[in-house]
UniProtKB/Swiss-Prot annotation:
Organism placement in taxonomy: Bacteria, Pseudomonadati, Pseudomonadota, Gammaproteobacteria, Pseudomonadales
Organism: Pseudomonas fluorescens (strain Pf0-1)
InterPro entries: aa-tRNA-synth_I_CS, Anticodon_Met, Met-tRNA-synth_bsu_C, Met-tRNA_ligase_1, Met-tRNA_synth, Methionyl/Leucyl_tRNA_Synth, MetRS_core, MetRS_Zn
TM helices/strands, residue ranges: none
Subcellular location: Cytoplasm
Protein name as annotated: Methionine--tRNA ligase
The organism's place on the tree of life at top rank: Bacteria
Family the entry assigns: Belongs to the class-I aminoacyl-tRNA synthetase family. MetG type 1 subfamily.
Motif ('KMSKS' region): 331-335
Reaction catalysed by this enzyme: tRNA(Met) + L-methionine + ATP = L-methionyl-tRNA(Met) + AMP + diphosphate
Length: 683
């Protein structure tokens, strides 16, 4: 027998600024099922997580509520922990990034990077709130859109016309925190030299650590050239001060992934047999997996492995990326009652219903998962109650009444029993590959065969016939053993159902290897109902309660739900627009013929764009991210082609190129896939 594997697993850290919703829960359930499967197989698998507890958003919310940030994150952690526990997410440790272990590790990693020459310093110019005495992120600046004139727009984009721009382009800018007029101010910032790790990342991201689709997306960023990453923020800021730099703090995304290490370190400090270096040391032979949503891929597949490499730690074995959650085919919506908090769900329905439905829909790819509430009711009722539990409920009574609850030593269906045994390796492979949907399909196919066999034997009819009692007991004993096999296959997904079944079967906790044996001459306990059907009325009550939960305190944004802790959690989506509004925007593929500096402009580059039959001149505020504009020459990008030309100090701008990121060094020009041609419409 092979040695048990040593595995450390993490999920993305939930942000300690709000409640867990079903989009978040997708990731934690997915991870928990995989961890439970590994433990079920006898492997050492440790699952750690933590609240992501730093940043301006937490500091400002605490101030608004009249409490300290420490009290706020303690309150949120208690809420998160309760939600996870009731959803049966079984962390070995759930910690906080605001902890001494994280402070020590963050400082250690930073100092190693600094001493190795991977940290740069330079001055940047930002808006500053003179009343709050703090620098303002883009989302904390509001003003009049420079494109369409709409008032009360954020510092980087307009919700009315969709334009993106630099905060300095806003007309009549105001601090969203104090209402004061911000002033421009210089500040010394610290940058992680991500380009130092370009070659390593190109090899590592193609080494099987990522799904192919994710590796392809990362390759686009690598091909475009990596930029240095701003890792500092100025006081006041809730986080860790950078060693030796008073008033300078680590940006939340620097210490957040280090929180994985800190949570494990905290567990090691309480568990003498665990060795931190055996899992995180440069030469560690343990496996390390991160489960994340697709919205935070760049942090985990670029910044994080580079930080680990530069600081002398091991890199992840794999990063498992999943998509977003939709409900009834649409973005989660507060007005429709489909933006459902974990607590609201738990107030109405069993967590195992959702665990099974997620498992039945989760493949190994990064596609979005749809929670169709009608299908949810039908599938859970049909598969779990109508198929799996039905086997035991049909047959247990005959054994209790006819043989005092004793299973006879007879296998009445050797071929079917062998088919169940033969299916186990394929189901195990599906679990291992995180293809839970295939594992559930193959398990339910076995349940169908078992039910068909029981229906054919019809013990309820045999029981009425003279002299057929031995056959009744043989059929029912075989059925109970088949039920036991199904429970073994489903245990990582349905731990409560498995525990209740183990109590009925009168057995110790089942392991995966138990599928190779059968119960014979074995005493059962009294059968009690294992699961009830979902009542659609309860689902409706849940959606009604979700409307009451959220519309009282938040306007309806029709927000999509990231199934993790990413950019959307910190910079929510804009309100929905109708199709006609979207259709009015003419998006085109553009070839950058030439990119050049603009004399006298601090933030602008002049781009000459080819859109097929004509060329356009566009000024774009991306200079801070692309200090060498010649590297953009010959690159395809995307532009809004029907913006009214705008007269600027340096000339006429005839459109707008599209980019992502919070600003400063972190601006990422968008590019179409290979094969796109200049002038093609983007649909």
């Amino acid at each position: 027998m092979s040695e048990p594997r040593k595995i450390l697993v993490t999920s993305a850290l939930p942000y300690a600024n709000g409640s867990i919703h079903l989009g978040h829960m997708l990731e934690y359930i997915q991870t928990d099922m995989w961890v439970r499967f590994q433990k079920h197989r006898g492997n050492q698998c440790i699952y750690v997580c933590a609240d992501d507890a730093h940043g301006s958003a937490i500091m400002l919310r605490a101030e608004k509520e009249g409490i300290t940030p420490e009290q706020l994150i303690a309150n949120v952690q208690a809420e998160h922990s309760a939600d996870f526990a009731e959803f049966l997410v079984d962390f070995d440790n759930f910690h906080s990034t605001h902890a001494e272990e994280n402070r020590e590790l963050s400082s250690q990693i930073y100092l190693k990077l600094r001493d190795a020459g991977h940290i740069a310093q330079r001055s940047i110019t930002q808006y500053f709130d003179p009343e709050k005495k703090m620098f303002l992120a883009d989302r904390f600046i509001k003003g009049t859109c420079p494109k369409c004139g709409t008032e009360d727009q954020y510092g980087d984009n307009c919700e009315k016309c969709g334009a993106t721009y630099a905060p300095t382009d806003l007309k009549d800018p105001k601090s969203a925190i104090s209402g004061a007029t911000p002033v421009l101010k210089d500040s010394q910032h610290f940058f992680f030299k991500l380009p130092d790790f370009q070659e390593m990342l190109q090899a590592w991201t193609r080494s099987g650590t990522l799904q192919d689709a994710v590796a392809n997306k990362i390759a686009e960023w690598l091909d475009a050239g990596l930029q240095q990453w701003d890792i500092s923020r100025d006081a006041p800021y809730f986080g860790f001060e950078i060693p030796g730099e008073p008033g300078k703090y680590f940006y939340v995304w620097l210490d957040a992934p280090i929180g994985y290490m800190a949570s494990f370190k905290n567990l090691c400090n309480r568990t003498p047999e665990l060795d931190f270096d055996a899992f995180w040391g440069k030469d560690s032979t343990a496996e390390l997996y991160h489960f994340i949503g697709k919205d935070i891929v760049n942090f985990h597949a670029l910044f994080w492995p580079a930080m680990l490499e530069g600081a002398g730690f091991r890199k992840p074995t794999g990063i498992n990326v999943h998509g977003y959650l939709t409900v009834n085919g649409q973005k989660m919506s507060k007005s429709r009652g489909t933006f459902i908090k974990a607590r609201t769900y738990l107030d109405h329905l069993s967590p195992e219903y959702l665990r099974y439905y997620y498992a039945a829909k989760l493949g190994r790819g990064v596609d979005d998962l749809d929670l169709n509430l009608e299908d949810f009711v039908q599938k859970v009722n049909s598969d779990l109650v109508g198929k799996v539990v039905n086997i035991a409920s049909r047959c247990a009574g005959f054994i209790q009444k006819g043989n005092a609850g004793l299973l006879v030593d007879t296998n009445a269906a050797p071929e079917l029993t062998e088919a169940f045994l033969a299916a186990a390796p394929s189901i195990a492979d599906a679990y291992e590959a995180r293809d839970f949907a295939r594992a559930m399909r193959e398990t339910m196919a076995l349940a169908d065969r078992a039910n068909a066999w029981i229906a054919d034997k019809a013990p309820w009819s045999l029981n009425k016939q003279e002299g057929k009692q031995d056959e009744v007991q043989a059929v029912c004993a075989t059925a109970i053993n088949l039920f036991r096999q199904l429970v073994i296959f489903l245990k990582p997904v349905l731990p409560v159902l498995a525990a209740d079944a183990e109590a009925f079967l009168n057995v110790a906790p089942l392991t995966w290897n138990d599928h190779t044996t059968l119960l014979a001459n074995h005493q059962l306990n009294e059968f009690k109902p294992l699961m009830t059907r979902i009542d659609p009325v309860k689902v409706q009550a849940m959606t009604d309660a979700s409307k009451e939960d959220l519309t009282a305190s938040q306007t309806d944004t029709g927000a999509a739900a990231p199934a993790g802790n990413g950019e959307l959690a910190k910079d929510p989506l804009s309100p929905e627009i109708d199709f006609d509004t979207f259709a009015a925007v003419d998006l085109r593929v553009a070839l950058i013929v030439k990119a050049e500096h603009v004399e006298g402009a601090d933030k602008l580059l002049r781009l000459t764009l080819d859109i097929g039959d004509e060329q356009r001149n566009v000024f774009s505020g991306i200079k801070s991210a692309y200090p060498d504009p010649s590297k953009l020459d010959g690159r395809l990008t995307m532009m809004i082609a029907n913006l009214k030309p705008r007269k600027m100090k340096f000339g006429i701008s005839e459109g707008m190129v599209m980019a992502a990121g919070p600003g400063g060094e972190e601006i990422y020009l968008l590019s179409p896939d290979s094969g796109a041609k200049p002038g093609q419409r983007i649909k």
